Amino acid sequence: MHLEIYAPEYKGDLKGLIQICHGMTEYMGRYVEFAKYFTSRGYIVFGNDIISHGHSTTPRSSCLYINDWNDTVKDMVSAREYVVRKYPNLPIYLLGFSLGSFIVRTNADLTPYKKEMLIGTGAQSAFLMRIMRTWIGKKYTGKMSCASDKIYDLMFGTYGKKFKGRPANYWLLTDNKKRREYAGDSLVRQDVSPAFFCEFSKGMECASRNLKNPNNTIPTLFLYGKKDPVSGFGKGVRKVYKAYKENNPDTEIRSFPGTHDILHDSGYESVFKAIADYLRK
């Protein structure tokens, strides 16, 4: 497991720790601007590259591959425990984006954290996830760890179709420069295995089941792009928000211009400020 830690140059008056669970295909190295913003304000920012992402390679496969969804949650816990030993007695805040938001939502114990922020999350049908997982398991028997263009298209293709006449990755980033940077990043993975999809579907199914009794024992802030198809253009994420709000009144939601990856799009400064304001409350 590869772990990135960004700390302020000074060690006095530290405000807290911010743990990031990043999104699918990307890695922690993409969060340098986020880290600069928050370390300059007295926070330590850290996070691990999720299994098979970035520098957290796996010997089982050369593409995006997860053997067991629970391993992603265990890695998140291990990263936190390591950093807390290094920087004890500081409040910890948790941020999950996209894939990372589902890792956060399936973590059984959030009590070590003071607040959580969920970005680009949504509500998926548990029944549909089971059907698709069964179908893929049969179709790709013996090829579960091999990259598949069809699996990639299954996971991302429908999002691009929501924006006719736009570039393929417009659903992810609206800014042309940001989109080129993403496409040209050699550590961003586009090769997805059937096993990865199946394990991710287990995480989404678990998060969907948990909506009946969501694990939101701490204050939660939902953030999403108004044109984000992953969040159901606001409909899916608001469904999750309402379930959380019923269990915990200390739950908020904010929307921003843009599509899915609002932390890296052209309006990222306003998202950073909203997070900083939330942490100060």
At which residue positions do the language-model features occur?
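Active-site glycine-rich loops that stabilize anionic/oxyanionic intermediates
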Residues: 22-26, 98, 226-227
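Post-His helix in hydrolase/transferase enzymes
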Residues: 235-236, 263-277
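Alpha/beta-hydrolase active-site loop
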Residues: 65-84
